[in-house]
Amino acid sequence: MAVRILVVDDDRAVRESLRRSLSFNGYSVELAQDGVEALDAITNNRPDALILDVMMPRLDGLEVCRQLRSTGDDLPILVLTARDSVSERVAGLDAGADDYLPKPFALEELLARMRALLRRTVSDDSGDSQKMTFSDLTLDPVTREVTRGGRQISLTRTEFSLLEMLIANPRRVLTRSRILEEVWGFDFPTSGNALEVYIGYLRRKTEAEGEPRLIHTVRGVGYVLRETPP
């Protein structure tokens, strides 16, 4: 049975382009032109994933994210943001989106992001696993709970996958390319700063109450989880 994706964008040309591309690649696609239509469609016939523009009339993409997450709905969400709008990306992730893609984008990259997001969704439900701990940071792969010093930390799927990879390899330097391959998939383009954005997000969330930094940059190589700078 085909994976069902709801595409939400007020630009008809964008909707139709995504419908053709996703359908050609084996997905079942439904369309909505604003947030109100999107929430109705999700209520009536819940899709497997959501591609959501941020700027829309009536109800924007950020509010759709917030409303879904406030009810505990963990529907995988990829938001489409303005090319140079860092604030939109930050707001989208804060609202609960799992990943973001700046416009204009290559369809190949959108397909790669969607495949990676759906892979992470499948891994969310797989098997039993032990809690992972480093310093005062704890991650539970089954319940998907993350705490630091007992403080609960809320992460999106992408942030969780990235932290899980780091905590599974404590004090080992992970190259940028290896992280991109494992978290986003082998077909993920290595250009752009998506990884840096998510590292920044993890740092902000894990250091929100002044805790010492655990995620360090190894310049020119990648990142490492350790108590002190390398």
UniProtKB/Swiss-Prot annotation:
Residues 4-118 form the Response regulatory domain. PROSITE patterns: OMPR_PHOB, RESPONSE_REGULATORY. Phosphorylated and dephosphorylated by MprB. Keywords: Cytoplasm, DNA-binding, Phosphoprotein, Stress response, Transcription, Transcription regulation, Two-component regulatory system, Virulence. The modification 4-aspartylphosphate is found at D48. Coiled coil: none annotated. Its main location: cytoplasm. It is found in: Cytoplasm. Residues 129-227 bind DNA. Pfam families: Response_reg (PF00072), Trans_reg_C (PF00486). One of its GO terms (molecular function) is transcription cis-regulatory region binding. GO terms for cellular component: cytosol; protein-DNA complex. One of its GO terms (biological process) is regulation of DNA-templated transcription. Member of the two-component regulatory system MprB/MprA which contributes to maintaining a balance among several systems involved in stress resistance and is required for establishment and maintenance of persistent infection in the host. Functions as a transcriptional regulator that recognizes a 19-bp nucleotide motif comprizing two loosely conserved 8-bp direct DNA-binding motif repeats separated by a 3-bp spacer region. PANTHER family: REGULATOR OF RPOS (PTHR48111:SF22). This is Response regulator MprA. It comes from Mycolicibacterium smegmatis (strain ATCC 700084 / mc(2)155). The lineage of its organism: Bacteria, Bacillati, Actinomycetota, Actinomycetes, Mycobacteriales.
